[in-house]
């Protein structure tokens, strides 16, 4: 229901801004908005088309793991933690393994693996759903974990900084790690409070402290490396782990006497079906965002925030990076464009350039994830998913600003 109102608001606000723009002499404003609808529709289809092959690959690999029993082993291993965080999912259910694969892929920055495993997890949770058009508590918790975007290796951002000539491309690594950790913990706490999950249970507290310790070790380890070594290690480690997962699943299937090839084909067929399912949802959300942006409403919001901050007497250095923060929940490619624009205009080593990179890495594309994940299982009533996801994003934004001032202010 919340998504419904937000989608309507995109068009209403865009029309109001277009009328104001026309009154002020901009005769091309309506054409820009209409053009954006066609561009966004085409972009949505191209995204779905691009996902088809990746979905086929990873759903095929997941099917091998499922038949080989690997997913069940992961589910049993993670059951003590996930049964506390997802109390409505039966103990040792295979979805636990899919959730782990998705979270692990996100942490390693392996987007190509994260989306298919995430969609697989949604399909498995939908099998447990009594109301097929309504999101369940486990679905919402899972979505919030995705939208908070916990990433240990932000490879793409580091590569962009290097290409723009940053003196030290990896200097945003630790700030991104800290900001995304805050966003993830905030998402878990907010959703747990909403769903009345007791986060003070020993298992959950131990897991949270363990996550913090793990991140601390990663920060310390990378802190001992120069930028070239760090870039090499992150690239090699990410791809080696990805290939290792594929090989482990295939070998597990072989030793369990599974017909690995047939299992892969069976799973891959689901990839095409899933890709087709999400097209309408992607078109809807990307067109809504497109008209909102083309109308100039986004620019007005940013200017309004800048003016408000300055009137309050606060340091407004961060405002130049806000377009990336505001765009990130709406569009990943849009936020990436804002980040690159900030580095181009202000410089990659400027405060704004660095903060825009931290914004880009601290959270994920909330509305895109909601559209794709819920769309894949035809969920229409998203309940508190949008609110929890955006609150986690907001926590990540505030954390990013504070951390940027601590490191680079």
Which residues does each predicted region cover?
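Residue-level detector of functional hotspots within protein domains
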Residues: 1, 50, 89, 94-96, ...
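Membrane-embedded alpha-helical segments and adjacent helix-loop junctions characteristic
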Residues: 30-127, 256-345
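Signature of multi-pass transmembrane helix bundles
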Residues: 1-53, 159-292, 311-312, 384-409
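C-terminal transmembrane helix pair
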Residues: 113-114, 121-160, 166-196, 322-409
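Generic signal for short, ordered secondary-structure residues
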Residues: 100, 104, 139, 230-233, ...
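Hydrophobic alpha-helical context, especially transmembrane and signal-peptide helices
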Residues: 5, 32, 44, 60, ...
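Alpha-helix termini
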Residues: 24, 85-89, 127-132, 164
